[in-house]
C-alpha cells in the first residue's frame, strides 16, 4: 500500500485565544494553527509514523497555502489537496475559558473544504491506502456526502469519525459552535446510513447518542450494532474508552492528567488508535495508545500542534510517574518540541552576513544596508541556500529572503559584548515573539561562566516562543558540556572546525549524550582562506553531526572592501559573492560525497 491512511474532509485554520481564562470576546491575541478533525488526525497519524494523505480543498489565498504547507511540513501527502478558486479556507475562533468551557465559532459557510467532489480523486488513489477516514460533518450536505460516499465505495477499509457539531448541521444558531449535542432524527438517519458501510466508528458518548438515536449509551450502541458490523470505539474523556466488537467489550482506563483543553484531544485519540489498528495490533493496545495520545493533547494549547510524535508517545507510555499537569513536564515538552512540526534540514549551507562592527569600519549605515541587499540578491540565485542576517543593517535583505523556504537565522547579541548582552534588551522573549517563526535565533558568545545566566534566559525565551536556537562559540575546545549542564539545549551549534577526528568524536559524544535531538553543528569561517576551509570540510564531512557551514567574510569581505572604496560595481559584488559561495558549496558537497563513497 502506498498509504496507511487517507483523511478526507475538514481542513481549516484555527485561531486560538492566548489569554487562558478569558472570554472569547476578551481575547487580545491569537495563535494560528492548522485545524479541522480530519486534518488534525492526518497530522497526528503522520507524527506517529504512518504514511498519510489528505483529501480536501483549500482556498486560493494565504490561509489555504498555510493549510497545505503545514500539512506538507508534517509529512502528509498534499497531492490531493485541491485549490478552490471560488471559495475561502474555513476559519475557527477558539478559546479556553475554564476547565469546562471552550468557546468556538465556526466560519464555514460555503468554505473550500465543503466543495470537495468526486472529481478530486479517483479509485486508484483511494484504493492505494489501507483505510479511508471521513468525518461526519461532510455528510451534512448532499454534494459533499455524495463525494464522500463515492470515496468510501473504493476504500479498502472505512473509518468513520462521527465528529458531530450540531451547528454544522444547521441545528443551532451560528454562534453556538460549542454546543455538542442536539437530538435530531434527520442526523441520526444520515449517520446510520454511513455507519452501515464502516469498519471502524469513533466518537464520544454524545456522538454515539446522536448516531444511535438514544441518549442512553448502551441502548445507542445496541441500535448501531444491529445495522453495522463496525468496531465501535467510545471516547469517555478522563475515564478512557470502551471498544465494542461484536459481543466483545474492552474497557481501557484513561490516564490521570489535568484537563487543560479538550479541543483536539479526540483527534489525537483517533490517531493513537489508528496507529495500532492499521498495524493489526490487539484492540487493548490500540485503546492504550489512543488514551495516551488523548491525555497528551488534552494537556496542551492547540489541536494539530499538540499531537504527539512516536518518540513522545513511547516515552509517555514507558513511565507512570508523570506530573498531573503534563505541560509542566520539561522532558515531555522538550521531546514534543524537538520531534514535531519541524522541517528537516539534513544540510545547511549558509552565507553569514550578519556582521555589523566589521562593516561599520568600512562605511556609513546607508552603504552597509545597500551592500547587504547586494549579498542577498546574490544568494537568491541558489536553491537550498541559507543565510544569517542581522536586523540592524540587513532588515531589507532579511525581508527579501524570508518566506522562500531557506534556512534563515538572525543574531540577538550585541556584537563583541563581554559579558553577553542582547540588542533587544532584557525582555528578549517579547522581541522574539515578533519574529517570523522560520527565523532561527543565533547568539554568538565570547563564552565565560558569567554568560550562562543570559544564555539560559535566551534558551527559555526560545522555548516559550517556539523559536530554534543556534549558539556560536568562537573558541577551540568549546564548553558544550558546561552549557548543557546549565539546562541549555540549543537546536544548533556553530563552531570552529576541530583539528582532529578525535576532537570531532568528543563533540559528537557530548551532543548525543546530552541532546540526541540536536539538529547538529555548522562550521564557522573566521575569514579563513578557501584552502583552509576545504581542509576543515574534508575532516568535518566524515562526521554526521556536522550538517554544513555558516561562513561569511571568507565569501564577501574582499568584495566589501573594494565596493566600499568605490572600486567595485554592484554587479561585480553580486558576481563575486555568487562565485565564492558556489565554490564553497561545491567543496562541501564534494567532501561529503567522498566520505559517503568511502563508507559504501
Segments from the language model and where they lie:
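Distinct, well-ordered alpha-helical segments
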Residues: 171-173, 180-192, 215, 398-400, ...
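Conserved phosphate-binding/catalytic region of the ribokinase-like
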Residues: 1-6, 186, 213-331
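Alpha/beta catalytic barrel-like cores
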Residues: 325-450, 489, 531-547, 557-600
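Alpha/beta enzyme core
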Residues: 371-377, 426-440, 448, 454-455, ...
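Glycine-rich phosphate/adenosyl-contacting loop at the front of the ribokinase-like
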Residues: 1-77, 351
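Conserved N-terminal subdomain of the carbohydrate kinase-like
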Residues: 51-136, 314-323
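Conserved, mostly hydrophobic/aromatic
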Residues: 351, 472, 493, 552
Amino acid at each position: 500500500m502506498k498509504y496507511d491512511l487517507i483523511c478526507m474532509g475538514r481542513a481549516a485554520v484555527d485561531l486560538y485565544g492566548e489569554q487562558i481564562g478569558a472570554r472569547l470576546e476578551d481575547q487580545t491575541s491569537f495563535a494560528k494553527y492548522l485545524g479541522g478533525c480530519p486534518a488534525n488526525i492526518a497530522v497526528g497519524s503522520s507524527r506517529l509514523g504512518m504514511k498519510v494523505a489528505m483529501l480536501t480543498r483549500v482556498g486560493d489565498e494565504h490561509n489555504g497555502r498555510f493549510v497545505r504547507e503545514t500539512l506538507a511540513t508534517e509529512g502528509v501527502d498534499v497531492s490531493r489537496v485541491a485549490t478552490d478558486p471560488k471559495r475561502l479556507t474555513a476559519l475557527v475562533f477558539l478559546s479556553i475559558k475554564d476547565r469546562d468551557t471552550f468557546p468556538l465559532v465556526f466560519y464555514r459557510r460555503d468554505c473550500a473544504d465543503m466543495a470537495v467532489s468526486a472529481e478530486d480523486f479517483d479509485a486508484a488513489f483511494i484504493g492505494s491506502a489501507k483505510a479511508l477516514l471521513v468525518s461526519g460533518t461532510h455528510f451534512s450536505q448532499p454534494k459533499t456526502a455524495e463525494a464522500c460516499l463515492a470515496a468510501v465505495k473504493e476504500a479498502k477499509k472505512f473509518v468513520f469519525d462521527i465528529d458531530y457539531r450540531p451547528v454544522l448541521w444547521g441545528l443551532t444558531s451560528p454562534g453556538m459552535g460549542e454546543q455538542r449535542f442536539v437530538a435530531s432524527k434527520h442526523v441520526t438517519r444520515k449517520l446510520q446510513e454511513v455507519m452501515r458501510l464502516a469498519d471502524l466508528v469513533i466518537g464520544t458518548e454524545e456522538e454515539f447518542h446522536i448516531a444511535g438515536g438514544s441518549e442512553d449509551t448502551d441502548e445507542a450502541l445496541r441500535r448501531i450494532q444491529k445495522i453495522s458490523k463496525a468496531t465501535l470505539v467510545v471516547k469517555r474523556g478522563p475515564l478512557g474508552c470502551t471498544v465494542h466488537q461484536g459481543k466483545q467489550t474492552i474497557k481501557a482506563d484513561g490516564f490521570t492528567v489535568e484537563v487543560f483543553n479538550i479541543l483536539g484531544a479526540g483527534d489525537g485519540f483517533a490517531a493513537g488508535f489508528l496507529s495500532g489498528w492499521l498495524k493489526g495490533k490487539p484492540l487493548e493496545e490500540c485503546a492504550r495508545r489512543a488514551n495516551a495520545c488523548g491525555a497528551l493533547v488534552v494537556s496542551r494549547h492547540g489541536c494539530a500542534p499538540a499531537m504527539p510524535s512516536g518518540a513522545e508517545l513511547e516515552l509517555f507510555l514507558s513511565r507512570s510517574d508523570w506530573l498531573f499537569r503534563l505541560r509542566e513536564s520539561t522532558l515531555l515538552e522538550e521531546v514534543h518540541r524537538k520531534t514535531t512540526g519541524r522541517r528537516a534540514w539534513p544540510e545547511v549551507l549558509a552565507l553569514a552576513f550578519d556582521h555589523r562592527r566589521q562593516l561599520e569600519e568600512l562605511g556609513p549605515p546607508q552603504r552597509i544596508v545597500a551592500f547587504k541587499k547586494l549579498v542577498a540578491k546574490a544568494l537568491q540565485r541558489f536553491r537550498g541556500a541559507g543565510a544569517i542576517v542581522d536586523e540592524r543593517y540587513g532588515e531589507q535583505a532579511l525581508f527579501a529572503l524570508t518566506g522562500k523556504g531557506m534556512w534563515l537565522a538572525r543574531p540577538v547579541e550585541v556584537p563583541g559584548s563581554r559579558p553577553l548582552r542582547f540588542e533587544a534588551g532584557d525582555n528578549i522573549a517579547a522581541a522574539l515573539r515578533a519574529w517570523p517563526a522560520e527565523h532561527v535565533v543565533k547568539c554568538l558568545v565570547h563564552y565565560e561562566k558569567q554568560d550562562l545566566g543570559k544564555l539560559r534566559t535566551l534558551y527559555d525565551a526560545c522555548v516559550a516562543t517556539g523559536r530554534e536556537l543556534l549558539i556560536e562559540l568562537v573558541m577551540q575546545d568549546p564548553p558544550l558540556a558546561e552549557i548543557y549542564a546549565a539546562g541549555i539545549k540549543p537546536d544548533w551549534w556553530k563552531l570552529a572546525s576541530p583539528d582532529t577526528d578525535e576532537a570531532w568524536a568528543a563533540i559528537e559524544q557530548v551532543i548525543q549524550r546530552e541532546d540526541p535531538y540536536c539538529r547538529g553543528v555548522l562550521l564557522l569561517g573566521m575569514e579563513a582562506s578557501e584552502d583552509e576551509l576545504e581542509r576543515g570540510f574534508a575532516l568535518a564531512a566524515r562526521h554526521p553531526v556536522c550538517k554544513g557551514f555558516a561562513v561569511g567574510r571568507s565569501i564577501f569581505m574582499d568584495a566589501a572592501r573594494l565596493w566600499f572604496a568605490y572600486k567595485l560595481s554592484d554587479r561585480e559584488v553580486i558576481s563575486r559573492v555568487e562565485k565564492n559561495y558556489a565554490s564553497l558549496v561545491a567543496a562541501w558537497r564534494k567532501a561529503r560525497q567522498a566520505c559517503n563513497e568511502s563508507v559504501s
